[in-house]
Amino acid sequence: MADAVILGIESSCDETAAAVIRNGAEILSSVVFSQIYTHMRYGGVVPELASREHLKAIVPVVRQAVEDAGQSYDKIDAIAVTRGPGLAGALLVGVSYAKALSFALDKPLIGVNHLEGHIHVVLLEQKQQGVGEIQFPVLALVVSGGHTHLYLAEKKDAGWTYRDVGHTRDDAAGEAYDKVAKLLGLGYPGGPILDGLAKHGDPRAVRFPFAQIKHRDRNPQNRHEDDDARVDFSYSGIKTAVLRYVETHEMKAAIEARRTALKEIEKPSQDDYLRVCDRQTLDLIASFQRAVVNDLVSKALHAAAENNAATLLVTGGVAANSELRETFERRAGELGLPVYFPSRPLSTDNAAMIAAAAYPRFLSGEFAAPDLSAEANLRLR
């Protein structure tokens, strides 16, 4: 068949992104407009502000992606857009624009689950690198600021299927990073800040135990025969433990001084963050990261074994974390379990992943109706 060129659009949180891919295997362009510095002063993403920024950015971002791909709009075969999950207002901007573009160009529209996109971007890069087909079933850990999920993914004749075999009961892992960074006066986004600082601390200085969570659904109709193979997460407890450590070790004055010092710097560098952190803070950060990483790795490997997974994918914004990657590679390697990550630029939100996830649907003719809507709490199944 002729080449299939898909334009992807992503606007689920604080990145406005567009990308063009060919045949689900070649990235022709990928443009991301980040709002990090817009939200940094507030210590986190402000939903209404995010929506406004998407409105400003979406037209030029899409135009740039098409130009960078060396394509014209009439050469686009389909338009894919994130329909959820995410921030309702932010999603609406992307969905509305994609629908308008689909109508104006008379091109089919494909609605994509954001979480499925994170899974497919790993497969996309494997194809780009000429790596052979991965083995199924696949266990995918999707871990980011808003999500911590384990999915058993299989590729069947009727398409891809996903079974939720574990998720967070409260905070996502990336959310815990953001909250701890804010608590320590380091600001937003917490993930890359803490990852950089953790290298300078002692990860054995503070002990953070995790409770083992057993899945129990009170509704018998929702119970699955494989419930005993589930692995769930919880990260609100470690955030509270960090707060207690701060209070009992009289760190609040130093934190306020750090917060004040960083406010004077418009775009702090990693060296700036390191300069305002004392040994006690660095040890606390390193211990926090070691605890979260060990919890994610141990539970993902346990779920892989319980569900007879042949391959492990680790994806999402937190997958860019250096210690997480190193620990997964070492421990999965010891078990002989292949583990794959997206490249760091494609770990965070982007539109190449949306176009990649749309490609199988394009081949099977699964197109969205003209009344496609955004769904903030969309589930992957």
Swiss-Prot record:
Substrates-to-products reaction catalysed: L-threonylcarbamoyladenylate + adenosine(37) in tRNA = N(6)-L-threonylcarbamoyladenosine(37) in tRNA + AMP + H(+)
Enzyme class, spelled out: transferase
Entry's Gene Ontology molecular function annotations: iron ion binding; N(6)-L-threonylcarbamoyladenine synthase activity
Keywords: Acyltransferase, Cytoplasm, Iron, Metal-binding, Transferase, tRNA processing
Gene3D superfamilies: 3.30.420.40
Residues noted as binding Fe cation in the record, renumbered to the chain: H114, H118, D349
Cellular component, GO, one term: cytoplasm
Cofactor binding note from Swiss-Prot or TrEMBL: Binds 1 Fe(2+) ion per subunit.
Chief subcellular location: cytoplasm
Binding, substrate: V142, V143, S144, G145, G146, D178, G191, D195, N321
Any one GO BP annotation for this protein: tRNA threonylcarbamoyladenosine modification
Cofactor(s) essential for the protein: Fe(2+)
Locations listed in the record: Cytoplasm
Highest taxon, organism lineage: Bacteria
EC number: 2.3.1.234
Family recorded in the similarity comment: Belongs to the KAE1 / TsaD family.
Function field: Required for the formation of a threonylcarbamoyl group on adenosine at position 37 (t(6)A37) in tRNAs that read codons beginning with adenine. Is involved in the transfer of the threonylcarbamoyl moiety of threonylcarbamoyl-AMP (TC-AMP) to the N6 group of A37, together with TsaE and TsaB. TsaD likely plays a direct catalytic role in this reaction.
Protein name (Swiss-Prot/TrEMBL): tRNA N6-adenosine threonylcarbamoyltransferase
Classification of source organism: Bacteria, Pseudomonadati, Acidobacteriota, Terriglobia, Terriglobales
Gene: tsaD
